């Protein structure tokens, strides 16, 4: 499964913003694009769609802050 | 040995300064001496808990042994099995000492539990955090020496900031690059100076000089609607300023001392009164507490509710999460009506803020948003925060019921 496309799709869905792929290095937390609720949804979608198990304590905002970082993390954990 | 409370008087700082000099020299030469660091910690723990505080010292020892045994046991168990009921039990046991300490004065007004000690509220966060990380598989081994260093880290023992085991361990086990350490020393110096101004000048002015006058004025002006008076309004703002400068000052000392010791303890305050809304506020006020509740309570609860599809409504899930988080935070402060009211106040406020943010998002094109609306938002948030602090202060209890 194409990790990059899946992640972008999930993010676009969660944020209601299709332009998310235009700025893959945007800090999603600083800009308020993602909050804790969206984070949990993201983790659940990653689990459901990419079979990646991320326990809540493993989630460090610094490592998951931008779409590119999320893709990197997802690939690492696959 | 005299008794010295953390960062409370010049002697503490003098002894601290002298004790840290060898450490600083070591770090500047690329060396880290855990044995010496431990001796310094022991010295300070003795200074904080000796004399008339010896019972607290004994309670602390008992507490650390209890939590250590609990976490050790759970860690060993968890490597083989992962029963949820047992995890729940481990968490309940971990918070038991704190619950007892909070309940005793509630059931027996005026009395304090003998197992209580300065910092028990904060150490409990560290212990529970470790259990949750063990449950998640992030911590796989119990390391007694590191556990003790983490729990008994003296710069933050009395009131935080609340650190996390793996982050602490990483800092503790490495020797910072010389340039990086010099940078840390610079930050530490800045923290000590700013902390001094915050705690001993501003906090003192607001808390010791102004606050009693406001209290007196407010008490003398009772009789109006809800006993509201200008004195009460004055009390609200003075108390809020005292709370910030005193606690932020303490946090700066704690973080500064940590930095000198090579541990980058996370900060607690980041211009909180510049927040345009309450959600942003909790990213800037008592940050380590806020993030602890967010990560270990809110996100876990939401994860659970969403995974088990308890309800389809994301809004309901978020709201349940907020209520749980803030009510727990209220209870954590103490079993008084005003701490619980404080929790409820923030829960309701953040729920309503989400309503507003959703509305704003939907009608983005029809709502004015510029520099002035931002100032208005900051102003409104600041004042509402001060109102919540008035509740938190417990002064209304004095005003209305005594």
Curated annotation (Swiss-Prot), chain A:
SUPFAM superfamilies xrefs: ACP-like
Give the keywords, sorted: Cell wall biogenesis/degradation, Cytoplasm, Phosphopantetheine, Phosphoprotein
Per its UniProt entry, which superkingdom is the organism in? Bacteria
Supply the Pfam families for this chain: PP-binding
Q: Where is the Carrier domain?
A: 1-78
Any single GO BP term: lipoteichoic acid biosynthetic process
Describe how it is modified after translation: 4'-phosphopantetheine is transferred from CoA to a specific serine of apo-DCP.
Main location class = cytoplasm
Report one GO cellular component. cytoplasm
Which family is it part of?
A: Belongs to the DltC family.
Task performed by this protein? Carrier protein involved in the D-alanylation of lipoteichoic acid (LTA). The loading of thioester-linked D-alanine onto DltC is catalyzed by D-alanine--D-alanyl carrier protein ligase DltA. The DltC-carried D-alanyl group is further transferred to cell membrane phosphatidylglycerol (PG) by forming an ester bond, probably catalyzed by DltD. D-alanylation of LTA plays an important role in modulating the properties of the cell wall in Gram-positive bacteria, influencing the net charge of the cell wall.
The family database entries (NCBIfam families) matched by this protein are listed as: dltC, PRK05087.1
Official protein name in the record: D-alanyl carrier protein
Which species expresses this protein natively?
Latilactobacillus sakei subsp. sakei (strain 23K)
Corresponding gene?
Answer: dltC
């Amino acid at each position: 499964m194409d990790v990059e496309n899946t992640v972008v799709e999930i993010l676009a869905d969660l944020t209601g913003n299709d332009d998310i792929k235009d700025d893959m290095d945007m800090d999603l937390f600083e800009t308020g694009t993602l909050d804790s609720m969206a984070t949990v949804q993201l983790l659940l979608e990653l689990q459901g769609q990419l079979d990646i198990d991320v326990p809540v304590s493993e989630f460090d905002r610094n490592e998951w802050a931008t779409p590119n970082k999320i893709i990197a993390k997802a690939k690492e954990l696959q | 040995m005299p008794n010295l409370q953390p960062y409370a008087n010049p002697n503490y700082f003098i002894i601290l300064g002298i004790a840290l000099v060898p450490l600083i020299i070591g770090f500047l030469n690329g060396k880290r001496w855990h044995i010496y660091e431990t001796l310094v910690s022991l010295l300070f723990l003795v200074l904080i808990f000796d004399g008339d505080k010896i019972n607290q010292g004994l309670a602390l020892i008992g507490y650390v042994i209890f939590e250590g045994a609990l976490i050790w046991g759970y860690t060993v168990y968890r490597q083989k099995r992962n029963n949820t009921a047992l995890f729940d039990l481990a968490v309940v046991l971990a918070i038991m000492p704190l619950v007892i300490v909070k309940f005793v004065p509630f059931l027996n007004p005026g009395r304090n539990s003998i197992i209580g000690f300065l910092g028990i509220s904060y150490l409990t966060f560290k212990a529970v955090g470790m259990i949750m990380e063990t449950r998640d598989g992030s911590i796989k081994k119990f390391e007694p020496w590191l556990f003790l260093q983490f729990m008994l880290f003296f710069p933050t023992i009395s009131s935080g900031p609340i650190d996390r085991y793996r982050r602490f361990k990483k800092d503790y086990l490495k020797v910072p690059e010389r340039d990086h350490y010099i940078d840390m020393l610079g930050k530490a110096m800045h923290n000590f100076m700013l902390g001094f101004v915050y705690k001993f000048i501003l906090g003192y002015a607001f808390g010791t000089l102004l606050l009693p006058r406001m209290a007196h004025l407010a008490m003398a002006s009772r009789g109006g609607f809800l006993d509201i008076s200008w004195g009460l309004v004055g009390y609200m703002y003075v108390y809020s300023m005292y709370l910030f400068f005193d606690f932020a000052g303490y946090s700066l000392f704690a973080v500064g001392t940590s930095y000198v010791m090579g541990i980058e303890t996370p900060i607690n305050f980041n211009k909180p009164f510049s927040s345009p809304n309450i959600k942003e506020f909790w990213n800037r006020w008592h940050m380590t507490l806020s993030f602890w509740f967010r990560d270990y309570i809110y996100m876990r609860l939401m994860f659970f509710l969403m995974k088990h599809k308890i309800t389809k409504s994301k809004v309901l899930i978020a709201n349940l999460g907020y209520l749980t988080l803030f009510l727990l935070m209220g209870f954590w402060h103490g079993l008084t009506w005003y701490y619980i009211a404080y929790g409820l106040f923030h829960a309701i406020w953040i729920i309503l803020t989400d309503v507003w943010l959703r509305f704003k998002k939907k009608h983005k094109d029809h709502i004015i948003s510029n520099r002035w609306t931002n100032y208005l938002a900051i102003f409104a948030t600041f004042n509402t925060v001060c109102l919540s602090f008035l509740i938190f202060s417990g002064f209304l209890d004095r005003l209305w019921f005594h």
